[in-house]
Amino acid sequence: MHTRVLHVLEFDKVKEQLLEHVSSSLGKEKVEKLFPSSHFAEVTNWQEETDEAVAALRLRGHVPLGGIFDIRASLKRAKIGGTLSPHELLDIASTISASRQLKQFIESLHEEKEEFPHLAGYAEKLAALPEVQQAIERCIDDHGEVMDHASERLRSIRQQLRTTEARVREKLENIIRSQSAQKMLSDAIITIRNDRYVIPVKQEYRGVYGGIVHDQSASGATLFIEPQAVVELNNQLQEARVKEKREIERILTELTSIVAEHAEALLENVDILAQLDFIFAKAKYANKLKATKPVMNDRGYIRLLQARHPLIDQDVVVPNDIELGKDYTTIVITGPNTGGKTVTLKTIGLLTLMAQAGLFIPALDGSELAVFRSVYADIGDEQSIEQSLSTFSSHMVNIVDILRNVDHESLVLFDELGAGTDPQEGAALAIAILDEVHGRGARTVATTHYPELKAYGYNRDGVINASVEFDTETLRPTYKLLIGIPGRSNAFEISKRLGLDERIIERAKSHISAESNKVENMIASLEQSKKRAEEEEKKAKEARMEAEKLRSDWEQKWEELHEKRDEIIEEAKRKAADIVRASQQEAERIIRELRRMQKEKQAEIKEHELIEAKKRLEEAIPTLEKKKKERKKQTQHAFQPGDEVKVTSLNQKGYLVEKVSDDEWQVQLGILKMKINERDLEYIGSAPKTETKPLATVKGKDYHVGLELDLRGERYEDAIVRLEKYIDDALLAGYPRVSIIHGKGTGALRKGVQEFLKKHRSVKNFHFGEANEGGTGVTIVELK
C-alpha cells in the first residue's frame, strides 16, 4: 500500500477525525501510526475489536479512559537508577488507577449477554499493582507535594521548620512594630531574600539592626537586612530545610525503586492502555459517522449499501449502492465533468482503506468489502513541477507505475483516464489500459468523459457502464450513481433551459450523426426506466420490511405466550405435586396411628375414634378436583364493571372499567388502562357499593408521578429524602423503569444516589444512561 495513495484518497483526513476521539497521548500515537493492513486475518481481528468496543459503548454509554499518561520515559529512568520527581510518580499512580478501572469495566461486561473475547484478553493482561499506587499516594498529595506523614523523620523535620519559622517571624514582627521602625524602615513588612527572612531598612539606618545585607532596591535607598537577632534562627531554618530536602530525596528514591521492581509490568500496561484507547476511539468514531461493521472477504468482492463519503457533511452527502467483483470486475463511469464521478471513485477507495485499517464504514449494515493486497489510484491533477511534466504526462507516470505491479489482488481507481491529450488518442489509450488491467483480474473503477468508452462497457465481458444522475430541471447533478447506464452530456438540455435559441440547438443537433443521436435517446430512455424501476423496488422493499417487522412482532408475542403458558403449567404441576405429597404423608401417618392402636391390642377401638380417623383421611385427599371446579366456576363468573380482577398473564391486579366487546374488557392497572381478553381474567371480588371509589383510589396516588426525577442542585440529604419518596411513588404507579438526573459535577451526588439504590430492596438494577439520555449525568433504574 503506497503512502501516496493514502494521501490521494484522503485517509490522513480520516485519521485527523479519529484523533478527536482518543483520550490520551498513547492513543494519539496509535492513530498517527495507523496504516491499512493487506492481511485478511489481521483485518478481521481489527474489525472484531472495533465491534466489541461499539457493543460495550452501546451497553454502558461510556468507558473509563481518564488518567492515562505516557510514563515510558519515567519507567526507563527508574530502571537505570534515576530518581523520579513527585509529578512523575503521580502520573504512574494515575495510570495504574486507570488500568484497574478499565480492567474492572471490561470484566463487568461478562454480565451482559454478548461476548467480548478480544477486550477480555486485553483486560486479563493488565496488571492491577495496587501496592505501587498505594505507596505513591500515601506519600504524595494531588499537587505533587511530599506529605508530612510520608515518614516519621520528615514529620519531625517539618515540625522543627514550622517552630523555628514562627520564632523568626515573631522576632521580626516585634522589630517592625516598634516605634522607631516607622522612620527606619521603608515598609513595615517581612520578606525573603536568598531563602532568609529580612526587613527593608532605609540606607541611612543600615547600622541600627546589625546583621547581614542580602539585597538592595533598584534606587539603592532601601537595604534588605537580616537583623543580627534572627541570624542564628535563620541558620537553624536553613539547616532544617537541607534535612527536609535530603529526606524528600530519600523518600522519592525509595518510591522509585518500588516502581523499578514493576517496570516491565507497567510498560506492558502502557501498551495495552494505548491499544484499548485506540480501539474505543475507533468505536466512538463509528458512532459519530453512524458507521457499521463491513463483512470482509478475500474474493475481491465489493457490495456497498447506501455508502457515504466520510469527509462530506453527512446531512448533504448522497448515499450510493455500489457492487463490484461478482458479475463484473470493471466499472466505467461516463458523463460530464463536475458530475460527482470523482467523489464516487474516492468513496470506494477510502471505504476500502478504512475497512482494512479496522474502522467501521459509513454504509448500511450488510455491506461487504474485500481485503486487497494493494490499492492504486490515479486521481486529480498531480503534475510534477520539478519534472516539468504536463497533466497527461504526470498521469501516465502514475499509470505506468500501476501497470508494473497490478494483479488480481488489486483495486485500481482511474480518474478521467486518458485525459489531457487528443480525444481520439486518449480514448484509445484508455481502452487499451482498461483491457490490460481487466485482463490481469484486478477490480477496477474508471471515470471518463470520452463517449467512445460507453461502447466499451457493452462490448466487454465483466465490464459495466455507470453514470452519475443529472437533474435537467435544476441543472445540477444529483450525485446518485446509476449502474448499467452510461452517462450523457446533457449539453442541449442545459443550453435550452438557460435560454439558447431553439434554432441554434437544432442546428447543433444536425452536426451530430444519427447513430449518436440514437444512442443518446436510448440512454435517456434507460435512465427513465431505471428510475421507475428503482421507485417500484423501493416501495416493494418498504412493504416487505413492514411485513417482516409485523411477522417478527407476532412471532415474539407468540413465543412469549408459549413461555408464559409453560411457566404456568410447570407451576401448577409443582403445586399439585406438593399437595399430593402432603396428602400421602398425612394418609400414611393416619394409617400408622391405626396400626399402632391395633398392635396395642386394645379391647375395642371406640367407634368415635374410627369415625375421626376416617374423617381426617378424607380431608387428606388432594383437593385438585375441588380447585378445578373452583377455577371453572371463576371463569364462568359474570363480570361486572368495578369488579376486582387479576390479569393472569401479567400477574397484576386491577379493576374492570367497561366491556369493549363480547370477550374483551378495559382494565385499570395502576395508571394504565389496557384491553384484556376475558379468558385472561381471574375474578377476585365484586365491585364495592360506592360508585367509582376503587378507581379514584388507584388513580389518586400516582396521578402526578413523572418518569424522571431531577436532583441537580440539591443538597445530598435533601436529595436522598426526595429520591426515597420518588421510588415509593414510582412503585405504586407500577413503573418498571425510571430516570434519576443527578448531573456530572464532582460526582458526589451521583455516588450517593447509586449507594442508596444499591441498598433499596425494590431496585432490580441500575446503570448510567445512553449518550442520548444524558450519559453519566443520569442513572436509569429498573424496579422489581
Curated annotation (Swiss-Prot):
PROSITE patterns cross-referenced by the UniProt entry: DNA_MISMATCH_REPAIR_2, SMR
Keywords, sorted A to Z: ATP-binding, DNA-binding, Endonuclease, Hydrolase, Nuclease, Nucleotide-binding, RNA-binding, rRNA-binding
Top EC class for this record: hydrolase
GO molecular function: ATP binding; ATP hydrolysis activity; ATP-dependent DNA damage sensor activity; endonuclease activity; mismatched DNA binding; ribosomal large subunit binding; rRNA binding
Residues annotated to bind ATP: G335, P336, N337, T338, G339, G340, K341, T342
Pfam families: MSSS (PF20297), MutS_V (PF00488), Smr (PF01713)
Protein name: Endonuclease MutS2
Annotated source species: Geobacillus sp. (strain WCH70)
Gene name linked to the record: mutS2
